[in-house]
C-alpha cells in the first residue's frame, strides 16, 4: 500500500503575484520512500495544492504496478470536493464549464489528475490541516519551506 500526502502554500493568493510552494511525501507500508518540494511563482494556493498532488504521483508512477493500491491525502477542500462531489464529471459533460457558467479554473492541471479519479487503484482522502496529522504537518513544512526558498527543487 502506497500513500501520498501533498500540500500547497502561498503568500498572496493572486494569480500573477502569488509566491508559493508545493510539497509531497510518499510512503510504502508506512515507511517514507520519497519526498519533494518545488518553489512556485505567479501562482495561487489551489494551483500549489494541485501541483503537489501531480508531482507526488509523477514520482510514484514509475514505482507502481496496476495491482498496487495508492491513497492520496490532502487538506485541500478544493481537490477533495472535486473528487467526492463529482464536480469533475459535470465539468467533462459541460465542456469544462463550472456551475457558475464560467470556464473551470486550472483546467490544465485537472486534466492530469482526473484520470486518477476514475481508476479504482487510487483513493482520495481529506485530512484536516494543522490538526496534528503527522504526515500532513510534514508536507505543510515542505511546502512552506519551498515557498520561502527561490529555486528550490528536490
Q: Language-model segments: which ranges?
A:
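RNase H catalytic domain
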Residues: 9-14, 57-138, 147
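Glycine-rich phosphate-binding loop at the start of an alpha helix
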Residues: 46-50, 133
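Short, conserved alpha-helix that lines the donor NDP-sugar binding/gating region
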Residues: 53
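RNase H-like nuclease fold core
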Residues: 1-47, 58-61, 141-154
Amino acid at each position: 500500500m502506497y500513500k501520498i500526502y501533498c500540500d500547497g502554500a502561498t503568500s498572496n493568493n493572486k494569480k500573477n503575484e502569488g509566491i508559493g510552494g508545493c510539497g509531497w511525501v510518499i510512503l510504502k507500508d508506512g515507511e517514507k520512500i520519497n519526498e519533494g518540494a518545488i518553489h512556485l511563482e505567479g501562482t495561487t494556493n489551489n494551483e500549489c495544492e494541485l501541483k503537489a498532488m501531480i508531482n507526488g504521483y509523477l514520482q510514484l508512477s514509475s514505482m507502481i504496478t496496476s495491482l498496487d493500491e495508492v491513497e492520496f491525502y490532502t487538506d485541500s477542500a478544493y481537490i477533495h470536493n472535486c473528487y467526492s462531489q463529482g464536480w469533475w464529471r459535470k465539468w467533462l459533460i459541460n465542456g469544462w464549464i463550472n456551475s457558475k457558467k464560467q470556464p473551470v479554473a486550472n483546467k490544465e492541471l485537472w486534466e492530469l489528475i482526473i484520470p486518477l479519479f476514475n481508476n479504482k487503484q487510487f483513493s482520495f482522502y481529506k485530512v484536516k490541516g494543522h490538526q496534528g496529522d503527522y504526515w500532513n504537518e510534514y508536507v505543510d513544512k515542505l511546502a512552506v519551506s519551498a515557498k520561502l526558498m527561490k529555486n528550490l527543487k528536490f
